[in-house]
Each structure stands twice: as C-alpha cells, then as structure tokens.
Amino acid sequence: MAKGIRHHRVGEAVDGYLLIKTATKQIASNSKPFLTLILGDHTGEIEAKLWGISPEDEATFVNKTIVHIQGDVIDYRGRLQLKIASIRPTSAMDGVHLNDFVRSAPLAPNDMLDEVNQYIFEIHNPHIQRITRFLLKKHQQAFLESPAATKNHHEFMSGLAFHVVSMLRIGKSLIELYPTLDKDLLYAGIILHDLGKVRELSGAIDTTYTLEGKLLGHISIMSNEIAQAAKELEIDGEEVLILQHLILSHHGKGEWGSPKTPVVREAEVLHLIDNIDAKINMMDRALERVQPGEFSERVMALDNRSFYKPSFHKKPIEL
C-alpha cells in the first residue's frame, strides 16, 4: 500500500500487506463460521470479516500472521471496515517483516527515558525519589517497550513511556499554575501509576493480559511493588503509604477500576491528568483520518461518540 491503513477512507481500495493482530472465530446467522480480523500496520488498524472459513483458514489466519490482502474500505455502522476480496499468508519471497507493522511512539525510547530521569532528578524528597528511581530501573527495558493498554489509548510500542512523558509535561504546567501542589508526589505518581502494566500486559505485538494481569491487575501489582521496594531500601515513612494511595486511586472510582477513591490532592490531580492524556490520545487517533467538515468514526471508549473536525481547519491530512 502506498499509504498506511489508518489513512484509507471509505471507498478506497486496499492492496498490500497487513498484520493480523487478532483473529476471532464467530458463527454467522446462517450457522457458518467466520473470522473477525483486526488488521494493522505501523499507522493503525482496521477490522475485517473473513466469511465462510474452512478449518484450514482458521489454522492459517491467526494472530501475528502477515498477510497480503486486497479489498475495499466500507462504512459499517459508523466505523471503517475492510471488505476482503482476497487474502493470503505471506512467505519469505514477499520480503516483509513483523517489525515493519508495529506502530511506535513518536518519540525515541532513549529520549523519553532521559526526560523521565530529569523529572526524577527534580524530586527532592529522598524517600520518594529512591523508590521511584529503584522501580523505574528495575523495569526500565519493559517500560520503554510496553504499550499503555491493549486498546483505546497509547496501545502501541513504547506507548507507556509516551503516556508518562506526556503526563509529566502536563503535571509540570499545572505545578507552575498551582505551586502548592507537591511536585515530588505528583511526578512520582505519574511515573509509577501504570508501571505495573509491564507485568499486566504481554508486550507490544498481539497485546493480551497475562495471568498475573487478569488475576491482580496493574494497580495491585504496583502497590505491592512500592511496598516491596520500600522494604528493600529500608524506607519507613508516610511517603510509602501516600505513594500507594496514588496508585490505588488513580482510576478515580471503583466502577472505573480503582480500589480507593482519591483523598489526597495530588491523587486527584494524577487521576485528572491521566484521564486528560488518555482521552486526547483517543480523540487525536479518531481525527487523524478525518477531513475538515467531517465526523470521525465512533469511539467506543468515549461514550461511542463521533468527533467533528471544524471546517475552518482547512489544512488537508498529510498522508
């Protein structure tokens, strides 16, 4: 394909290579099996249906398989879908590689690490700084590679680090506006809040939940890691308890996955920053393929809303 899958619009033909990110077998109303495929490249992903499959198809078109595909982009209930005309698995003769299809953060991993470490250097409370530095160093490589989620926001290679860097920048601006905020707590909370996802999620390709992720979740994982780090570093103080509270409450409410609601000011601010960055990322992704004067496809995680790009934004999409 001359352009990435995320930049295709309704009515356009697709003829190129895509990665099967997920393949889910389902049964149609006529009782015949079919596959729902999530296909992607380094720009994004699109859903497709493979109808009337055989057992051989089911065994062939599986997760992490690169395929050559032809078809057309259609609108299905407000979302883009690829209508498949032909599909085949690739071979060595095609000269394509898995890494070519993995979407990555727009910043280099080492640059993001340098920036995060600079924020850690600005943490003056020795207990908070030591715990934060200890845990980041422990999970450094996974932190730089992991996505921030399986779907919805920052669900790409190095997405976790990019999410953290973006949140730190927001946090710094808020501290300049509200200087009574505890910078040490807020920076540490931002850096650590999703670090448990390096154990909760399987990686950047075909991201799924690990057994530990399903049974415990990243919030409980990181709360426990903070306690263990404090023990190893022989740190005993209220800072440990407050850091754990920031982690346990950063989703805001029980129905959103938090065991506790925020009752420390920096915990509430952490939750708000997390929410802002995640939602802006989702809206940006939805509007990437939209021309001025058009609505995006529906975003399930944002109340199934379609977002409008104002018509006075005349600059065309750069493909």
UniProtKB/Swiss-Prot annotation:
It holds the Pfam family tRNA_anti-codon. Residues 163-279 form the HD domain. Keywords: DNA-binding, Exonuclease, Hydrolase, Nuclease. SUPFAM superfamilies: HD-domain/PDEase-like (SSF109604), Nucleic acid-binding proteins (SSF50249). InterPro entries: 3'-5'_exoribonuclease_YhaM (IPR020873), HD/PDEase_dom (IPR003607), HD_domain (IPR006674), NA-bd_OB-fold (IPR012340), NA-bd_OB_tRNA (IPR004365), YhaM_exoribonuc/phosphodiest (IPR050798). Its EC number is 3.1.-.-. Residues 12-90 bind DNA. It is an enzyme of class 3 (hydrolase). Shows a 3'-5' exoribonuclease activity. This is 3'-5' exoribonuclease YhaM. It comes from Shouchella clausii (strain KSM-K16) (Alkalihalobacillus clausii).
